[in-house]
């Protein structure tokens, strides 16, 4: 099948030097002179020349359209500022002047600084407890500064508990009980055996084992 398909296709013509000379010169005519070295160099240079250069050369011969300045092109387009874009996204109409006279960065930073309240304007305390501190401070300031209350300073001593001093008729009985408790604690601390004496008594009662 493949051979039959190949036979149906027309073969490409083969180029031979003898047949080429016969076709160019014709029968009974002398062959044309061989090209010189200059012709060969010219043909090589034409082949080596890129097509982009030829296109540029042909384009230079055609008349160019009139040159329009860049400013005219810019004026033709509507000026869209950053403010307009942000206003479109936020759904608000721009109220400030156009951004051609104002720097967008300065405008943005100015807006952010205006939105942030100053630290002086902020109250020192925030939340529900802030409203309770005001009347308390006013009441404290309205009260006259008098003498300190008649409470005795209670000092904590090592080994003793805080207790108010006895009053009137209970003074003698409370004082006696307090002194009795302190003396009992002192006697108990004196009669407590030391750990060294306890160990000695234990060692004396333990049986002695002699090694053989």
Curated annotation (Swiss-Prot):
Report any one BP term from Gene Ontology.
regulation of autophagy
Induction notes from the record? By progesterone, testosterone and, to a much lower extent, estrogen. Induced by oxidative stress via FOXO3 activation. Up-regulated by hypoxia (at protein level).
Location(s), subcellular? Cytoplasm; Peroxisome; Mitochondrion
Q: Which tissues express it?
A: Expressed in various tissues, including pancreas, placenta, ovary, testis and kidney.
Mind telling me which InterPro entries this protein's record contains? DEPP
Keyword set, alphabetical order = Autophagy, Cytoplasm, Mitochondrion, Peroxisome
- What main location does UniProt list? cytoplasm
Q: Record's superkingdom?
A: Eukaryota
| Region ranges (Disordered) | 20-39, 49-79, 113-176
CC annotations in GO:
cytoplasm; intracellular membrane-bounded organelle; mitochondrion; peroxisome
**Where does the record place Basic and acidic residues bias?**
113-124
Explain the purpose of this protein. Answer: Acts as a critical modulator of FOXO3-induced autophagy via increased cellular ROS.
- Could you tell me what this protein is called? Protein DEPP1
Gene that produces this protein: DEPP1
């Amino acid at each position: 099948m493949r051979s039959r398909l190949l036979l149906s296709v027309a073969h490409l013509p083969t180029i031979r030097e003898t047949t080429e000379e016969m076709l160019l010169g014709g029968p009974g005519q002398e062959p044309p002179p061989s090209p010189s070295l200059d012709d060969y160099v010219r043909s090589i240079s034409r082949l080596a020349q890129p097509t982009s250069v030829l296109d540029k050369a042909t384009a230079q011969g055609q008349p160019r359209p009139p040159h329009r300045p860049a400013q005219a092109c810019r004026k033709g387009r509507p000026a869209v500022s950053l403010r307009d874009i942000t206003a479109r996204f936020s759904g608000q109409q721009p109220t400030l002047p156009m951004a051609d006279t104002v720097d967008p960065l300065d405008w943005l930073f100015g807006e952010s600084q205006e939105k942030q309240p100053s630290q002086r304007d902020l109250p020192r305390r925030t939340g529900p407890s802030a409203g309770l501190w005001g009347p308390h401070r006013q009441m404290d300031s309205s009260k006259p500064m008098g003498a300190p209350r008649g409470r005795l300073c209670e000092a904590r001593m090592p080994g003793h508990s805080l207790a108010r001093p006895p009053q009137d008729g209970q003074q003698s009985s409370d004082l006696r009980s307090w002194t009795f408790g302190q003396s009992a604690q002192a006697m108990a601390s004196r009669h407590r055996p030391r750990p060294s004496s306890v160990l000695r008594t234990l060692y004396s009662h333990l049986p002695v084992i002699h090694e053989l």
